[in-house]
Amino acid sequence: MPILLLKTLRDLRHRTLRSILTLFGIAIGVAGIVAISYTARNLAVAQTAVYADASQADLNIGTGDISPTIRNVLERLPNVALVEGRVVYYTRASLDPAAARWPDLRLTGIADFNAVQINRIELLAGRYPEAGEIAIDASARSLIPAEIGDIVYTRSRVGDRPLARRVVGFTRTPAAIDASILNQAFAYAPIADVRKEANLTGDNRLLFRLEAPDEAGTTASRISRILGTRGIPIGFVIVRDPENAEGRRELATLLQLLTAFSILGGVLSGFLVSNTISAIMAEEMRQVGIMKSLGAGRLRLIRTYLLPALLLGGAGTALGLPLGVLGGGALGTFLANLLGLRLPPPNLAPREPLLALTVGVGVPVVAAAIPAWRGAGTPVSGLVRSYGVAAARGRRFLDRLLRPVGRLSALGLMALRAVGRRPARSGVTILVIAISAAAFLATQTLDASVRGTVDNLYGIYAADAFYSVGRTVTPRYATDLSQLPDVARAEAWSRTAGFVGPLNVDVWGVPSDTELYRYRLLAGRWYSGQPREVVVSADHARRDSITVDQLLQVDIGDQRRPFTVVGIVDDESTYLGSVASGKLFMTVEDVSRLTYYGDGANLFALSLTRHDPAGVDEALARIELATRDVLPGTFAAYADKESTLQAVRVLTLLLRAMVTIVGIVGAAGSANTLILNVTERRREIGILRAIGAGRGHLLRLLLAEGLALGLLGLAVGSVLGYLLARALVDLTGASLFRLDFLLTPAIAASTAILAIILSIIASVGPGLLAAHLRPIEALRYE
């Protein structure tokens, strides 16, 4: 075995704990990068497969009751390759007919499960349902914990007689967000059963496959006109868009954030290697001096001390690559299940090993080159000179600055002076701690900003619930609802989907004198009630460069009408997976003219006397029972907010996992530095023990050093964390919705506590090492 390799292995074995900490940091950095790359690549493949799958609908149109005859007419239109009908009915389900809470259920009726060609579902267990039976999406078991053979009861409203169905299978709905996030279960039943329950004779959902998907907008307009001329209302039109698929932007944001933190982990591992090489060279200064005096050049010396970095990097890569692939597989499976995607079989693309080598070997070698170059360039006289223990108090500005500390605590003064003994090493350690603290502060700020923004956005809507009717009523029905004991105020609203050019928009009909929509004007004014006035949400105004007084062509169904933009409001609240580019607000009458509701109303916003979730649920149950003659349906506003917060919790969970890893690497870096300090100061420690310093004194000394490093790292990390938090909030806001930056004193305090705790924990090991060092061994060193 070459002598240089033997020397390197001896050096690494000589300081086993230090080498293990460095190896651990490299492996974690490699694993993080590989896991994110593996996850992102496989999820991209899964999303591409879903989009490329001929099963997916190019157009998804929600309609009123539509007969098979009209469906046949639509199938003969140009560019239409295939049309299939469904019945989608929103109801509630429970395993107990006497249960107090019934989760929301989207029940889809299919005519022939074995002949489905569009939006095919996958049968995971059991069989497809027949009359009186139901198949439940597997993700819905988090809301409805059913097993095959169980009886599931469904009812649309309080007071209805529950319908019993036997569970005969479990399915998987491709590209559907997990039921636990949406707080809505999915299930399938024979179309005849669902029609009967929904009181329909035909279908209410049309799925289209097109010959030229890029002409979907034109085809959708043609279909809307045909349905409009027949008086069939259109609830929404969804054009399949690979760049704006359901959940795509949320996933992209998550992966971007995870990538940022995995890069931080890789950078920290580089710092660990740099510290290790610096320590090896510091321990072997005399040997380096002798080699230089015998004619060894700088490059030869650098090669000598780059080999430990290569060995540590290679070993870290060997450990981190499989760990990253396993972690990426687990993370990918978790995210794929949330998004209804099927991952490809386990695989390894060239980019994962390349990334592993770059982070595991490239970063350590570059990090090691700096101390190696600096050490190899030191003059021989400086390398062979032996240092002693001398009184240097008062000789430097730092000593004079720290003199008050010495009056309070001699140990505290020694700890602070020890931090300044190796400025480069201490600086790197402080930076490692700072990055860890910054990562924690940034993620906590991002979480608080998202939650605070969600609270503010949903605070715009003062309605506690939305109330829909199955029979035609007039807007004056709001007065009847206001007379109910549980209702403080009721307003007739409306909601539908539309287009502004190629962009999907949510269209809201809201009274001009509303009290249940607390609009926040950014420009212009709220509409006065005059026809053809519209207020646009800020996100849509930005995307389409809309300004006040601009004329906007709005398409709803087969109707196109020009509207004058009179205002822009701050309202970017949206449901998870929404493909709408923003919101339009106009009078209820304008929406009715465009949707054939005439003088009828189908949606009411309710402010209730109680606002807590339990009180809202109880009030809605009583309201449904009191107004069952109009076939009401209710939706609690808190449920939509809870769905959004559930998605935020997933984001927060994964980010905190990454920050935990970064924090562990940071603690390892701090421990590494303290171990190096103990190693270099063995003679000093021996002298302290010889003159009477006890083990407790030495332990407190190392704890004080660690605390000093932690506090300095916290100071730097607070600044870096603020900048990083700003960047993360801006990045997330650009991908999802605009976020309000929220950095609270509690976040700053928790960051400080975490930095101090990690510093103390990292100091315990080196402190015990110093405390158990025998004086005779320390003074005999070298």
Give the location of each predicted region.
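Interfacial "coupling" helices/loops that link adjacent transmembrane helices in transporter permeases
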Residues: R15, F271-G313, G669-A708
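Peri-transmembrane interface segments
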Residues: A46, R222, I226-L264, I280-A282, ...
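Small-residue-rich transmembrane alpha-helices
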Residues: G270, S274-I277, R286, L311-L341, ...
